[in-house]
Amino acid sequence: MISWTKAFTKPLKGRIFMPNLFVYGTLREGENNHKYMKEATLLSRKASIAGSLVDTGNGYPGLLLENQLVAGEWYEVSEETLKRIDELEEYFGPGDTRNLFDRIECQVNESGGTHLGWTYVYNRDDYLETRFSDWKQYRLQHASGIEEKQDVPHSL
């Protein structure tokens, strides 16, 4: 397995490569945690990965690894931004049982091709059974009456 932290921050001809991140929930543009992305570079507004989304019942979605397509956005982020998002998502490190979300390597599809990077998958069994592919669309169609909390773990 490639260590993306090392692979994407290794200088090449004076340039520092930064990790890429696929976001699918409250970190997307127009959502309540998009402020965490203010220093990120948007690579694509129309990206997708394999999986499906579930409603956690807490005002944010969770990603499950399944064979559907999930809509989202594709960003280049700094190590500092990635660390702040790790904290937001309650990601403590690989295999840590306290993780609310696990950060995993993923294959992202967008108009420019297929790329590798990071995303977060939900690490709990407590969610509503309905599966969907686009958080923004789902949230608009299924106003649940649950007020979205700010600065608590909200999935991508």
Swiss-Prot record:
One term of GO molecular function: gamma-glutamylaminecyclotransferase activity
The entry's keywords: Antibiotic biosynthesis, Lyase
PANTHER family in UniProt: GAMMA-GLUTAMYLAMINECYCLOTRANSFERASE, TROPONIN C-AKIN-1 PROTEIN
The protein's role, per its UniProt record: Cyclotransferase that catalyzes the last step in the biosynthesis of the aminoglycoside antibiotic butirosin B. Cleaves the amide bond via transamidation using the alpha-amine of the terminal gamma-L-glutamate of the side chain, releasing it as the cyclic 5-oxoproline.
Catalytic activity: gamma-L-glutamyl-butirosin B = butirosin B + 5-oxo-L-proline
Pathway: Antibiotic biosynthesis; butirosin biosynthesis
The enzyme's E.C. designation: 4.3.2.6
Any single Pfam family the record assigns to this protein: GGACT
Natural source organism: Niallia circulans (Bacillus circulans)
Name of the protein in question: Gamma-L-glutamyl-butirosin B gamma-glutamyl cyclotransferase
Cellular component, GO annotation: cytosol
GO biological process, one term: antibiotic biosynthetic process
Family: Belongs to the gamma-glutamylcyclotransferase family.
